[in-house]
Amino acid sequence: MSAQNYELAIELFQKAYQLQMQGELELAIEFYKRSIELHPTAEAHTFLGWTYRHQGKLDEAIAECEKAIAVDPTLGNPYNDIGAYLIEQGRYEEAGPWLEKAIASKRYEAYHYPWYNLGRVCLATDQYSRARECFRKALEIEPRYRPAEEALDRLRRLVQ
């Protein structure tokens, strides 16, 4: 691949992200796809999946995350995202292993997300002690992560 194609792929990815943040999801999808055609990256597949999720297309979102993992299995984001999408589908037992893979991944800037999501799985499956551990671990990593604080508060009220 030429350096010119690589640079264009990056520009298309950045434009796709900008469009996604502006709520222009259909256009964002087209730009992500064009970026992937020029230079497939785990990030582009993951963000395309995230865009599908915002459209309620969870199966498509999961499929893109699986493609991301095939491109770069060290990136943690797609593992976490698959877990989160499975949670949205009520498929808690399937979500857990994906979240554990995110936690074990080598490349991830936000490890508090899979810990929080694993806590959600544990809470939904009545594993309250483990849920507490997961929410606390998320807060240890990111002390001001509101969803984990709120989940821990709900859990305390639930088990009193």
Which sequence ranges carry the predicted segments?
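Short coil turns that delineate tetratricopeptide repeat
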Residues: Y6, H39-P40, P73, R107-E109, ...
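A conserved position within tetratricopeptide repeats
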Residues: I36, I69, I103-S105, L139, ...
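Structural signature of tandem alpha-helical TPR/SEL1-like repeats
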Residues: M21-F31, H54-K67, Q89-A104, A110, ...
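Glycine/serine-rich loop-strand microenvironments at binding/catalytic pocket rims
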Residues: E66-D81
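Terminal, low-structured helical/coil segments at or just beyond the last alpha-helical repeat
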Residues: M1-A9, R120, A124, Y128-Q160
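Long, contiguous interaction/recruitment modules in multidomain scaffold/adaptor proteins
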Residues: M1-E11, Y17-G23, L27, R34-E37
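Conserved alpha-helical positions within TPR/SEL1-like repeat arrays
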Residues: F13-M21, E43-H54, N77-I87, Y113-R120, ...
